[in-house]
Amino acid sequence: MTEFNEGWWNCFCSFANELANVSSSASMVIRNVLDGAGVSKKEITDNLKTQHFDKRVVEELEEYKAKL
């Protein structure tokens, strides 16, 4: 399961970074993906340390994490 989670976060990072650069509705899509995946505060915190998210995505993740 660890490998799956790492792969999921790698894909999410690429997807979210690209989406944030091209879409005005990126926030809604990112939140829906996170809701659907059932991510936890710990997962977000850990991945903010290891992944290279764009600034806008970091802000979205921090906001999402605060609401969990």
Where are these regions (language model features)?
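Short, charge-rich amphipathic interface segments used for partner binding and complex assembly
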Residues: N21-K67
